[in-house]
Amino acid sequence: VIRGKQTLVIDESHFGNLVSGHKCILIDIGTGDGYFVRHSAAKTPDRLVIGIDACRGNLCDNSRKAPQNALFVIANALSLPGELTNLADRVTINFPWGSLLSGLLTGDAALISGLFRIMRLQASLEISLNGGALAEQGWPLEEGAERIFRVLKESGLRLNRAAHAARSQGVTFLPEHLGQAAGLWP
């Protein structure tokens, strides 16, 4: 866990107390600079907001300024910490690139199983895509969005609404609400 420039280790008891003090938990994967997490935590003080990113340096500024209900975890999206199992009622992935985007496009088993593991039953998963990042990986925006939608559906996620593109903004939001297929919970 990072707070400003300090890396902290939170023991199981402290983490349990932090989690039990919040009925709703948002986990943002690939949180980048942490602005989304900081802003979300400030807007919803009754919700625990956890940002996960592999790059420690990006998180320093916003983790220092974040409210107490924000937690920043240094971890790779392809190897999510076990402590997050069945915690999230909402998971967000905002503008993925690199290995996170590749994992979504290819259905990387570690990423997909990690998503399944951290989500509570009927959790929502919201993914916002960047056309430029998709283009760098050889995918037009609409085709990349459809590919990710198909990968998630084939992995056993129950899709409640179809994907839709906000073409004028170059961003695709997909899917807005997902729940896990009941038979696939560990």
Predicted regions and their residues:
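Conserved SAM/SAH-binding beta-strand->alpha-helix loop
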Residues: 55
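A short acidic, Gly/Pro-enriched loop at the edge of an enzyme's catalytic core
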Residues: 78-90
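Conserved beta-strand signature within the Rossmann-like core of class I S-adenosyl-L-methionine
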Residues: 122-129
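Class I S-adenosyl-L-methionine
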Residues: 137-186
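A short glycine-rich, Lys/Arg-flanked "PGG" loop and its adjoining helix->strand segment in the class I
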Residues: 107-121
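S-adenosyl-L-methionine
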Residues: 1-27, 35-42
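Conserved SAM-binding strand-loop segment of SAM-dependent methyltransferases
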Residues: 68-77
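A short SAM/SAH-binding and catalytic strip from SAM-dependent methyltransferases
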Residues: 89-106
